[in-house]
Amino acid sequence: VSAAIMFDLGVVSCLEYLESIPWTEDEQEEVISLLEHLQIDDSATEVLLRVSSDPSTADRADDIFLNLLSGILQAKDDKARREMKALLSRLLKEDVSNDSSRLDVSKDTLYHLCHKCISSLLLCLSEATGSDEKLDRGAIISNITREADNIQWIVDILIGKKMSDEFVKIWAEQKELATLHSKVPTVYRHEISRITAQLCIGIGRGHILVPKEIRFSVLSTWLEALYEDFGWMRRASRAVDRKLIEDGLSQTILTLPLLQQQSVLLNWFDRFLNKGDDCPNIQKAFEIWWRRAFIRQYSAEPENSQLQITLSDYPS
C-alpha cells in the first residue's frame, strides 16, 4: 500500500520490519515475490540478503557438498552421523524439478567418495586377514562395517539421482575385495553383501540400467558372498527386508540370457537344499526359468537348443 501511494517512509518502515523478523518458508516465497513485483529500489536488497546467493557460491558448491558428505563419512559420533545422513539424503532427494537454478552434488564428487570408501574397505579387509598382532581387531571390524555402510549410503544417493550404472561395473570388478571378503568371518563382513543386495534390488526394480554383461559380472563376483552372508544379514539387522532382497535378486537373474539363468539357478537349487532359510528363497525365479526353458520355449532354431540338464537316477 505504501509503495502504491508513493509513501517512501512507509515503504522503508515495512522493509526494516521485514528485515528484522524471521520468515517461514512460505512467507519467504511471498516476500521475494512481492518485492520482485513492486520493483522497489536498492533498499530491498538488505531484506533479501538472507536468501541471496553470492555469485561465487555456484563455483564452490561442489566443494561444499564434498566437505559435508566427507564429514558424515568420517563422523565420530554414530548418532549424529545417522541423523546427518538422513538429513542430507532427504535434502538431496527433494523434488525441485521446476527449479532450474538448483545447485546439486556432481556425479564426480559422489564417485570420488565411492572410490575412497572402497579403497578404505579393501585396506580394512587386508588388515583383518593379516597376521599383525599389534592391530586392534575390534577397531578393524568396526571400520569394515562403517565403510560398507558408507558405500551403501552413497550408492543410495546415486540410485536416487539415476547415476548408479557406473557403480555396478565398479563393484563387479572388485575381485580382490571379494577374495578378501571370503576370508573374514561372516559376522564381521555381512554388511558388505548388503551392497550387492542393494544393487540387485535397484536392477530388479528397473532403477539401475546396465548391460547384461555387467549384470552377470556382478553376480559372478558377489553372488556367492551374498549366499554365504544372507543368514547373518537378516538376523543381524531389522532393516534387512528378506522379501525385497529375494525379489530383487530374482528379477536380476531373470534379466540374463536363458543359459546364464540356468547356470545361476541350478547352483542356487543345490545350495538352497543344503542351507534352507540361510539362503535366499528365489524359487519364483526358478519357476519362471523352468517355464521358459521347458514349457514356453522360444527359439529361432528349436532343434539346436543349447540348454543342457543333467539328471541323476536314484534307486527307489
Residue map of PLM features:
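Enriched - but not universal
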Residues: 156, 174, 225, 235, ...
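Post-BTB helical module
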Residues: 1-84, 94, 98-99, 103-109, ...
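Generic structural signal of hydrophobic/aromatic residues within well-ordered alpha-helices
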Residues: 31-35, 44-48, 64-69, 84-88, ...
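Extended alpha-helical solenoid scaffold regions that build the rod-like backbones
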Residues: 71-219, 225-229, 244, 248
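Eukaryote-biased recognition of C-terminal alpha-helical segments
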Residues: 35, 39, 241-316
